[in-house]
Amino acid sequence: MKKALTILLVMLLAVSLFAQGAKESSGITKSPFSDDVEVRVVALKGPTAMGMVKMMDEGKYTFSLESAPDAVVPAIVKGEVDIAAIPANLASVIYNNTGKVEVLGINTLGVLYICGFGDSAITSVDDIKGKTIYASGKGSTPQYALETILNSLGLVDGKDVYVEWKSEHAECVAALASSNGSALAMLPQPFATTAMMQNKDIHILYDMNDAFEAIAGTPLVTGVVVARKDFIKEHESAVKAFLEDYKASVEFVNSNTKEASELIEKYGIIKAAVAAKALPYCNITLITGNELEKTLSVYLEALYAQNPKSIGQKLPAADFYYL
């Protein structure tokens, strides 16, 4: 178990996409579910937590929010929480190292965008060639998505383009701002929106999510929601109820921008003004059942072909998916 946890924590160093800059975790304690079954849910501040705010406000579940994955993985592995929203490839790593989790659904599709100065969209190789691209999230979804797109365009890092990896999204924005328009930055939502609100000259120039899907034949999958296998076995009715409530919450967030943004700020995720502008670009969803297996398995196969380590050295077995 210690060895498995060590491997998982090493993987977490690269999973920065979900952390949105807060330094401390914030716990949101809600009342127990029903029939003496307390459903404990943890999510990372960002798009996955944004899709859950209606559930947080209804009070059926015990929620906690974290700023970084290193607090989430040990909690789900040790049984301190029952359900967790985590990066898609990390779910596969946990499964392959412990066998203790099952994926309930995909909750976030692509949130990556290439940003730069000006408002001229990137439409050809020449718009990227020779430029520096500042990026964060090396070793996780951002790196694999960027490499897939660059390879499809015939661009070689270090020769045709120059990818400079940063540890935080804020560093990418600062580097972009000091480039005098000569560089680009790969940013996730809602951070891309925050950057644009801080600097009116920065714009989204390229949608990496559409590009990845066109190339790989599968959507870019950012996040999933997983549950402990033991919890599913013991309380499957509670899991099914959770998924119904989650679906309703996602529909509410995607259909009621103003009200959802206010709840997003209420629970300390991001400011309402940022959320209102970012929500249309966050690709918050809930894909379950056969469509979950079809979409996620193809995505993990694409990652495996690039780097087996990114998903835990092997493709997950059928019992990885809750159908």
Give the positions of each predicted feature.
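Secondary-structure end/capping motifs
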Residues: 232-306
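Conserved C-terminal helix/tail region of periplasmic/extracytoplasmic solute-binding proteins
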Residues: 297, 301-323
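Short, low-complexity disordered leader/linker segments with a strong preference
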Residues: 1-38, 62
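Short, glycine-/small- and polar/acidic-enriched structural segments
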Residues: 27-156, 163, 183, 189, ...
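Short acidic active-site motifs
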Residues: 71-72, 168-172
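Short, surface-exposed acidic
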Residues: 157-161, 268-279, 311-317
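Sec/Tat-exported extracytoplasmic proteins
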Residues: 56, 80, 85, 95-98, ...
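Pocket-lining segment of extracytoplasmic ligand-binding domains
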Residues: 88-90, 171-263
